[in-house]
Amino acid sequence: MKSSNGSNNNSSFCLEVWGTDYNKIKNTCILAEKLGYYGFYYGESLADIDLDCWTIISNLSAITNKIKLGPVITYLLPQYRNTFLLAKQAMTLQEVSNGRLEFRTGAGATLQWSSQWWHPYGIDYPNNAQRVSILEEGVQVLDMLWNKQTTAVSFEGKYFKVKGATLQKTTINQKRIPLTIAAKQNKTMQIAAKYADIWESSYITPEQFTSLNKKFDDIHKQFNSDNGVNRSKKISKSIELDVIIADSDSDLEYKKRVFAMERGPSVAHQILKHGLVGKPDEITEKLIEYTNAGVDQFFLAFQDPFDSKALDLFMKAMATR
């Protein structure tokens, strides 16, 4: 795909997948690798909308060769899972996948939106300020466990405590695990500037991304200046978007109606306004707008993640541009 100024663009395209039908998940991952998608990321929650994420992606690593794997988002909540266990799970997957894990996290959605996913399982979903502090401590602990060249790690925080913890490192799992942090707020963008390899925003227009991207770059430069370092010459930029693609007007309108029934009219309207919706040429033009705004990676939630025709149609459109 080329940007409007004619320069080549090497954007990567990733799939966001949820669901409980393992055969569909497996077959879609195999197809995604064949079609040239960069990554395949599976949902994580305790609810019945999906299976266990880390079990699934470990299995997928054994039946694929190149495609990157990881969670759509994995949670650092102390009530949910011991962070040392999570670090060990990640390093193990990095080993068995031959270095293909990409780890994704963030502070999480609002209390009003997300509490319903946690309360049935005895977990009190923290407020925004608490979640931001948990994220900051959690990624610091993970960074120490994965990357610090010491035999033991100790950390004393408000939410996480580690004393003399060690993780076995091998040639493969010593390779840095790429860390994506989803962030829109000042504080979470500061955390991303300090620790992330990939910074991600979600469901915004190219114009909004341009503004937020500039803000993130300023935060990153300020972090480097304040600390006298150049932590990363370039942090990749990612955006999460919904996708509805069809090769005819009638099919497109049908998919939009189904989407509205599934999500509800008001939610669907907001998503459609910010998503990649249209025929291949229309979606390609929208992608060019995002790449011109600074997007390196597209994290794509197709209306039906198991729609093989749509997945193929999308990648064919990218190949012809």
Predicted regions and their residues:
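N-terminal beta1-alpha1-beta2 module of alpha/beta enzyme domains
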Residues: 1-71, 175-177
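Flexible, glycine-rich active-site loops centered on histidine and acidic residues
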Residues: 8-20, 79-152
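Hydrophobic faces of well-ordered beta-strands that scaffold small-molecule active sites
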Residues: 11-17, 40-42, 69-73, 101-105, ...
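Short, acidic/polar
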Residues: 20-32, 85-89, 181-194, 277-289
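Acidic (Asp/Glu)-rich catalytic clusters
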Residues: 29-34, 57-66, 90-100, 193-194, ...
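Conserved, mostly hydrophobic/aromatic
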Residues: 36, 60, 93, 142, ...
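Glycine-rich, proline-tolerant flexible connector loops at the mouths of alpha/beta enzymes
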Residues: 39-63, 75-77, 203-209, 299-313
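Alpha-helix-loop-beta-strand connector modules within alpha/beta enzyme cores
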Residues: 51-74, 134-141, 222, 313-321
